Amino acid sequence: MSVLDRFKDTSKYDRVMRELGMLIVLNRAQRQEPGLFLKKKDADRCGWDGDPSDFPEADERVETFGSDGAEEEGIFFKSPRLVILRGAYKDDITFVENSKERNMIEGLYHEVNHLYDRWKENHPGQPSPYRRRRLVLCYLVDKNGVPVHKKPLYISMHGGASKVFCQRYAQFLEQLEGAYAKATNDKSAQGFGERMCASVIWTPTFGAEQYGETQKSPIAVPQSWLIPTEKSIFSFW
């Protein structure tokens, strides 16, 4: 019996929930290319034990962040292999953050969305500081579908990047549901529930697209992915 085994008794040695690591969406025009980036500190936070070679297009690199151009080491993913646990469906919980208060979370979107109207009434003609923030909980997995870190990561998005990400993920799920129905000889394709969706492997390849109604700007979005078919269905689990 190892000395470590004593700590498995959580009634004596309780555990705590720590802050989760984040996958950053690289979408600014000056970036080398769009995709997801895992900072080294977030790799440590999630218990990373993978390697860039576990993924179709990934490598170790240095990226700059913030107005001071701080450099961060990490891993870049052009085509991350994702298992999405929660947050990427359009009806999943989102939050309202206040950009004037250092991105402080004001509350759940469906509970505090009146803040937008109140701002328009009190500050006519001024841009709203409120943004709808989406957090997508996920795992990065190897080619066998095994997570390469011990704790889940989250992807934080807002605006067009969030909207398009959800649309493309929903499109992928619908393709997979159709392929599943063919593979199982079901008469009709039915939508997957939460638990089934949380077991699916999605491998999007990110690219840049112009987004905006009046003034367009580049955003990083999933542009393509492995299309599910009756023959390839098993590779998505």
Each language-model region and where it sits:
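OB-fold ssDNA-binding interfaces and closely related basic DNA-contact patches used
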Residues: 1-153, 189, 215-219, 227-229
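Extended, charge-rich, solvent-exposed interface segments
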Residues: 230-237
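Extended serine/threonine-enriched, polar tracts that run as long, contiguous segments within proteins
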Residues: 132-227
